[in-house]
Amino acid sequence: MGSFLRNRKFREIVQQAVVLSIVAALLVAMVMNTRASLEAQSLTTEFGFLDRSTGWDFSFSVLPFSISDTYRKTMLIGLLNTLLLGSLGIFFATLIGIVIGLIRTSRNKLFSSLGTVYVEIFRNVPLILQGVFWYSIVSHLPRPRSAISIGDAFFLSGRGFYFPVLNIAMWSVVLMFLLLVSWLIFLPWIRHRIERPSRYHQIKRTGWLILPVILVGIAYLARVPDTPLVNYPALKGLNFKGGMRMPPELSALVIAIALYGGAYIGEVVRAGLMSVPRGQIEAGFVNGLKNYHIFSRIRLPLAIRAVLPSLTNQYVQLMKATTIGIVVGFSDFFMIISTSINQSGQTLELLAILMGGFLMINLTIAFVMNTINKKIAIKGYEVKS
């Protein structure tokens, strides 16, 4: 027995078994206590309510919706609304972050100072306050008759942001998206299977020339009959008709998340650019490369490899930040779950759905980013997030 106790591996197994037993006992006790509490209140835990109609409506939906639709469809719409908000926020936050990161590393004192001021303001003001601030501005824009026009195609008003949209079938949108994603996956795959870089760049250039032609062809063939290819918004009476509308709640949240996330991503990009060894940059100058080529072929590729793990964390945080939509009345996943709890009383089931939904989204983001990180990592220098 003494020899077993002196064995380090045996002690570690015993310690882990004790900890797991304690955790399991606590979980069982929590489940039993919750079950007893629900039985005392004559409440049941079941998911049959998902097939009942909601009986209530909400302001924005990416899919057609009516009050007779089920809770199941309502949950799906809330999840899609959150994905839309999160995707737009992450996209624009990334663009802003790249610009801010470049400005922060600039040798120009004015640009560098402006970048610092931006980061300090938007990073230190709570996101929920920024959301309320931008919503108060967007909702007080002029009425449709006095809307701000941009090229007679884009209109800003207190009822939302109106912009042109293609009159094409939904299947074509899905097909074009799949083609674009397939091409982006194909590029890194073929890069590792072609020995000559010149051959790879030739295929890459040809693909980027052919792909837009294919996408335009699909859009033209899939357009709705007897309608123009592009549907422009136009003022008819007291409101705009045609085109597509982004409601003020969504617009304000996208602005808030993009500016807030851009400050953090800007710092991540700045750190990545500064992490590139000075010797490699000087080696580029020695080989006769110009500043642009040094940045695009040496500094930027190495910086991307360095920032991906931190960028993954920022994307996950920004996706979770979409829950502030309830403050301005945007029908995101969190708001719809909260309303469903009030209407149905199925608290535990709906909270489980909420946690499962965000867990699925964030694990997917982490998986995609980690896969990209592994694909572009230099062997021996992999960084795990």
Language-model segment annotations:
Residues 1-385:
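Transmembrane alpha-helices and adjacent helix-loop boundaries
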